[in-house]
Amino acid sequence: MSLETTVFTFKISVPFEEWAAVYDSHENIQMNKERWIVCLYKGIKKNDPTSVILIEQGGEGKSIAMFEDPAVKPLIESAGHIYDSTDISSYF
């Protein structure tokens, strides 16, 4: 299986620290571990604190599959992530 780096850019409806606390929660870390997904970077746009970049690395298609999982979508949205604002790019 190829290693893939996935870049998510999206808007949030809560302060970044609040969103990051959910992303860094034990539950989310466990979900990522089970899928062999590693967070390489997360941050906010310099001039727009509602714009987030998240860079993850894992097996090909793993990050996108988790993001698109209907069971995970409510967790994503409950963190303040505006789901429909998400742009995804993948790199090998």
Map each language-model feature to its residues.
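Short S/T/G/P-rich N-terminal loop/turn motif that feeds into the first structured element of a domain
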Residues: M1-P74, I82-F92
